[in-house]
Amino acid sequence: MPRAKQSMDGNTAAAHVAYAFTDVAAIYPITPSSPMADTVDQWSAAGLKNIFGNQVKVVEMESEAGAAGAVHGSLGTGAITTTFTASQGLLLMIPNMYKIAAEQLPCVFDVSARTVATQSLNIFGDHSDVMAVRQTGFAMLAESNPQEVMDLSPVAHLSAIEGHVPFVNFFDGFRTSHEIQKIEKWDYEDLKEMCNMEAVEAFRAKALNPEHPKMRGSHENGDVFFQHREACNPAYEALPAVVEKYMAKINEKLGTNYDLFNYYGAEDADRVIIAMGSICDVAEEVVDYLTAKGEKVGLVLVRLYRPWVSSALLKVLPKTVKKIAVLDRTKEPGSLGEPLYLDVATTLREAGMNDVVLTGGRYGLGSKDTPPSSVFAIYTELEKDAPKPRFTIGITDDVTNLSLPEVKPAPITSAPGTKECKFWGLGGDGTVGANKNSTKIIGDHTDKYIQAYFQYDSKKTGGVTISHLRFGDKPIRSPYYINQADFVACHNPAYIHMGMKMVQDVKPGGVFMINCQWTDAELDEHLNAADKKYIADNNIQLYTINAIDKAIEIGMGKRTNTILQSAFFKLADVMPIDDAVEYMKAAAKKSYGKKGDAVVQMNWKAIDAGLDAVHKVEVPASWSNPAADPAPKALKGPEALVKQIRDVMEPIARMDGDSLPVSAFEGNVNGEWEQGASAYEKRGTAVMVPEWNAEKCIQCNQCAFVCSHATIRPFCLTADEAAAAPESTKLADTKPKASEYKFTMAVSPLDCMGCGECVTVCPTAAIEMKPQESQADQQAAFDYCVENIRKKDNIPGVVSEVSVKGSQFNQPLLEFSGSCAGCAETSYARLITQLFGEKMFISNATGCSSIWGGTASISPYTTNKASGHGPAWINSLFEDNAEHGLGMQIGYETVRENLITKVEALKGKSADLDAAIEKFLETKNNTKANDAPAKALVAALEADGSAEAAEILKDKQYLAKKSFWIFG
């Protein structure tokens, strides 16, 4: 009987199967595995029954280590138990994993494989986490796409129960875990039918219980431990047969051919790739393309990674193979090769296949996209008489020269007739949600296959989102970014100014739609020369739509997503437009019906507006030979910072980081970045920004106090400074009384996120939100003040620099972060830097604050304009922040105390030096009071000129008392 089809991602597929076989789920959330735990929790709360006829008991622990401990305990008492994790979370479970495996307890850890943090945090996918647990005794099963996750996850659960070996069931984080496809799903009756209930009962019967008491986890001495450890060998030797048995059962039900290893390609292939995970789907596309041209290539898909079964690999390898490339999605610095490569090498060596050329490649670290061009490059390399023994793909390694050259654009390998669409949105603008809704409409109401994948930058709400959607009449095996699209939409006009390469991803003759408020003449001014030429030379169908004003007119505020979704259906030709409108309106009624008919009608108006508001732009012939763009402004600032911005930050900011070579990071291999880069971004993504009314303002500074991004700031200017200010600078007499200064509240339209908190807090309605372009002249005023105006003394109304008003005249040393618009967290953090920033160490836990505060190359923490000092920031882990911060404080104070001992030893050399030392020692424990004495001591030591003084001066940065902060 055919299985039901449903659009879902890999996480949901894994959760669907896990729920069926689980008594207890002990969970702790970590990206990208969290949706699995959340889904299981929701189903349990809704009363869903598993194959045993029970609701799953879900318990959330205090950490991943706690979740693993709870899993271990639950298993010991006879409950079949599951958890879901990734990355550092999985690593925290390792001690318990050794115990669970050694005690032969049946459980499954579903892992959406994610990068383990190294020189930086990365929340995206590779195999560094699962490869770090391959020695624990857990069996390991890999899947390549959401359908395989659905099909093969039962093998892990069923084999664990019968084979007495726990499993790590893993698939690629984000690329598979979050990729939406229309797949066939299991009926729980089919899963129940396959389950060995006798093995379940045997497990429960052997559980710890006072009614038949036993002892587990005892202490053993060296006389017996080794022998006892070897006693588990038969279980691992028998397990592959158990896995094969359940794969055969699934194949019988589904008509598939799943095996421990699967071969795909020419029967007489001489060039073969061996890999596991989502790259296998990419490789299959390339194999189809090359074999159709008569090339002898193939692919081995690794399903059961542990236990490793050499005979099963040799069984599927073509006898004609001459060269093999093994692909690992992890890096082990200093090793002879990565794990999968070493396993294959051992297999070939033990089989006497020394004449086969074996190479090993790394790919996809941190979710690096692996398109067909990368796989083509491997097969091309294998054609050489002496291919590189070690290589990388998907990057340009101009340092150690390991990367393979790739030809782009590569041949199109996706299924014929596949419609590919790409959407550039802003985090929180509804683009991603609308596209998920679109795929659901198309998946549920047509026979088409669908694929949806969503790409993000490192910012929170307000960052770049890119939605990759594919629709077709044949299964879609394309787990890589779209770069030859039929339809591309730019949902935020700021991306045009930022130089993002969007239209270049449109196929010749394809559609490019821009959401903007521009006329055709204004569009001509905004588009750069490269975009114009590409549009003209490739017959791109260019459209604009003003969803911004339409949304306001309808009453939807900033939410343009429904209007733009409707426009997509009109232009993309993926289904009849009348049907699309009907389904969109039905979805709106279902989603918003509880909020009342007025809300439903408003969404229906938005759908109709999207159809009517699309405007076709007639492309001028002059665009084939456009005028050159003006030269970019020269960057000003410290040389190291300017280099970082030019060579690294700017490409990353325009979503072109993939183009950076390895040499771009030679100067900061350890992950260290210059502070203050965010001030150079000037993204201009807010549609509405503040306009300050000098007459109404009472100069309370509350607007600056609450601003999450430090984009509205008070300044007091002398007469000379006011005279030199840009003409657009708004000035007022100081309040509550006039003084020698002029006051301004400067606003940065290009940095503002448009949250409106300043408007909300203003007691006199002195701030209004206005269209960003109407405030363009205020940017020069803001930049002038930031660059030239310093804090003044004796400002009227300032009773203390730690008051609301007084604090805001201090330079914020956290500015223009990647946090959400209106984020209160950054408001507090910014305030702390205004009070203590020049002397701050920050230990920042992994989490929201480490993302908005620690995006590589775009640091929002900066330095004081006068002193050059500012927060020294570091992130260790999520789980150790208090300890890490304590270690920083202990380490610093230890070095400082040792230095102070040397200072004390200089007493008696001279009266001036003694006086400086005495004052320094009196204040050494007071951060604020110690600053001037520390500077005076440095001057006295420099004047002394002795060898002892010179030795102290080598570490003079330790003299002034600092403060230590831990941010969660």
Question: What is the predicted function of each stretch?
Answer:
Residues 580-581, 593-752, 759-968:
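Ferredoxin-type iron-sulfur electron-transfer modules and their immediate structural context
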Residues 52-56, 167-262:
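Conformationally flexible catalytic loops at phosphate/diphosphate-handling active centers
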Residues 123-173, 185, 197, 346, ...:
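Conserved thiamine diphosphate
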Residues 140-202, 357, 367-408, 602-624:
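Structural signature of the thiamine diphosphate
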